[in-house]
From Swiss-Prot:
Keyword field contains Lyase: yes
GO molecular function annotation: 2-succinyl-6-hydroxy-2,4-cyclohexadiene-1-carboxylate synthase activity
Pathway terms, separated by semicolons: Quinol/quinone metabolism; 1,4-dihydroxy-2-naphthoate biosynthesis; 1,4-dihydroxy-2-naphthoate from chorismate: step 3/7; Quinol/quinone metabolism; menaquinone biosynthesis
Gene name for this UniProt entry: menH
HAMAP family given in the database record: MenH (MF_01660)
Protein name per the record: 2-succinyl-6-hydroxy-2,4-cyclohexadiene-1-carboxylate synthase
Enzyme superclass (EC): lyase
GO CC entries: cytosol
Annotated source species: Escherichia coli (strain K12)
Amino acid sequence: MILHAQAKHGKPGLPWLVFLHGFSGDCHEWQEVGEAFADYSRLYVDLPGHGGSAAISVDGFDDVTDLLRKTLVSYNILDFWLVGYSLGGRVAMMAACQGLAGLCGVIVEGGHPGLQNAEQRAERQRSDRQWVQRFLTEPLTAVFADWYQQPVFASLNDDQRRELVALRSNNNGATLAAMLEATSLAVQPDLRANLSARTFAFYYLCGERDSKFRALAAELAADCHVIPRAGHNAHRENPAGVIASLAQILRF
């Protein structure tokens, strides 16, 4: 079994760019940014429980990494960058730390490296279980209306929130709930030490208005790019800014 994805082919000899979306997104999420890099072959992946991979369920990050590895092999992708936002960034960091043949580097936008103590994990587990129950039992429009009121999305205006609620409500609540439970921050290990000892290139993007993830970025041994005029979802709020940062990274 492999993950559903959309492949776009570029010039031979350059590494692939493999894009991983955030929670409740899909393979279209990164395309406005990714299509600015037409010289590179691009793979836009649907993570388990999402988009064309909605019917695929996993028990945890190990399963996601295994599916990602098999998907890369199926597309004969031998050299690649992982580019991930939020959940996709966490998947990228986990997979990279577990080892992926052909990995050139990881570019993470607003991805959490992991909670650092049992108290934080227990608190997150309680919170995520409440969201899981809501995704299972309530209309998605109601759930996402509250989801986008969370502090991390404070930079969104009302129109942006309405647009995201409408877009994300096209998902399947049950498969979102399963993926949220399987990849909760409560079950993700703290990756800071692994990332410090990494053998791959590591870059971190965060919006200038995303104070939480700017603080997290400062804890990581990563080259950090702050995206102007953007909050947590920088590639949506300022795609040109993210394109500029990716172009700078890929020139090295």
